[in-house]
Amino acid sequence: LSYVAAVDLGATSGRVIVFGLDESGITSDEIHRFANQAKWVDDRLVWDFPYLLSETITGLKRAREKYPLVSCGVDSWAVDYGVIDGNNQLLGPVYAYRDPRHDDGMAEFYTRMTWPKHYSIAGIQKIALNTVYQLTGEAGSKRLSEGYKVLLVPDLIANQATGYVGCEITNASHTAMLDARTHRWSPEVLSAASLPSHLLADVVQPGTGLGTWRDKDLEGLPLVSVASHDTGSAFVAVPFNSERPSLVVNLGTWALIGTELSHPVLTDSAREANFTNEIGYGSTTRFLKNVTGMWILEQIRAEMLDGGKQPDIELLLSEMQGAKAFASHINPDDPVFGPPGGMVERIRQNVKGDIPSNRSEFVRCVLESLVARVAQRVGLLGELTNTTYQEIVAVGGGSRMDIVCQWLADATQMPVVTGPTEATALGNSLVQWLANGDL
C-alpha cells in the first residue's frame, strides 16, 4: 500500500485522513478531527492559526505512528491569508472572511476599477470576502509595509512546516487577482488594490514538492502541493459521468454548484449572474456559484442545545420531518445570515411566511430554503453553459442527508447520485499519488 495523509482544514472543523492505495482499491482512516471557529479579538474576527498548525501537526504525528506515510498535503477554505516577514515569522493575525470590515475594501477597490473590467480579467464572483478586497482594505498597513509575502492558509501552513514560499494556483485563482487566461498575477488588478507585486509569491501547480517537515516528530515527511482550495480538491475526486453531462453540488459550510470546463466563461451573462471561474487541477476551469450551505444549520445547532451539547444531525433531520412543509422561507445568501451567533433570532426577523416556533420548524425552513436556492442555481448554470445537464453529483458532508438529496432531485427533476462524502480529502490524496507516481 502507498499511504498518504490528507489535511483538510474547513471553516468549522479540520481533519487528518490517511488514504491507502493498492491494486484492490483505496482505503481510508480518519486519524484526527478537531473543531475550528473564528473568534472576535479586538473587534476583529480572526482565525487561531497557531491552533490550526498545532492540530495539523498532532494529526500527522498520529498518522505517522500508525502508517508509513509517503507524503502529506494540505487544503483549506479559500481567500484568507497571513503575512510573513523575511524570517518566515507571522505578522499579526489571520483575519476571517466573515469579518464585516471587508465590505469597505470592496467599495474602495471599485473606485479604481470597474466591475466589468475586473470580471473580464479574473472571472471571479463579486463577494466581499474575496482576498483582493481584504487586501485593498489593508493597503498601506504597517504589516503589509513590513511584510515579505502574503500567503493563503495552506501555503502559510507549508511555509511554517518547511520554509517553502509559494502560492498554489487553484487557491490563487480565488483571490480575484489572477488573470483567468494567462494564469499570472494581473498587474491591473494589483494596481487597483494598491498592492505591491513583490508581496505575492510565485504561482505553483498542484503536485509540486514543497520540501519536508522540520518539526522533530515529522522530520523528513514530504509535503506535496495539492489542489489547495478545498473545492479544487473535491472536484479532483468527483466521478463525472462521461456518458451524460453532469454537474456537482458540494454541500458543505458553503454549497457550491458547478461543473468542469476546458476554458473560463467570461461573458456578460456570467458576470451578471455573478458566477465564478476558478482554476482547477490540470488547468481546467471550475465554473460555479457559491451559495450559503450548511452554515446556518451549523449555527442553529450551536444555539439549540440538548443538555449543553449540540444535537446530532440525524436527530434534527428526524424531528424536521414532523414540521409542516413549505411553511416558511429565507434567502440563505442574505448578508444578514453571514456573521456567527444570534442566528435563530435573525431567522425570526427575516423569515417569509410563518415564523418558526420550535427547532424542527427552524431546521425545515433552513434546509428547504437551501435546496430551493441550489435548484435555482442549477438551472442558471445550464443556461450559462448552454448545456442540458442530466445528472447531479452530490459530495461533501451534506450529501449524507438522504432527504436533502431527494428534495434536490425533486426540485431539479434530475437524478442525484452521491460521490465521496470526504471528496476534498480524497482529491487531496489523489493529487499526492499522481505526484508520487503511484497513479
What are these regions (language model features)?
Residues 211-217:
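Conserved catalytic cysteine-centered active-site region
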Residues 61-130:
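Active-site phosphate-binding/coordination module
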Residues 163-172:
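Enzymes and membrane/adaptor proteins characterized by extended Gly/Ser/Thr/Asp/Glu-rich
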Residues 5-6, 18, 103, 110-123, ...:
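Active-site core segments that coordinate phosphate-bearing ligands/cofactors
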Residues 1-92, 146, 218-223, 412-414:
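N-terminal glycine/serine-rich phosphate-binding loop of ATP-dependent small-molecule kinases
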Residues 51-64, 182-188, 373-380:
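Short, well-ordered amphipathic alpha-helical segments that serve as non-catalytic structural scaffolds
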Residues 72-78, 206-208, 251-254, 391-399:
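Glycine-rich beta-strand-to-loop/alpha-helix junction loops that act as flexible
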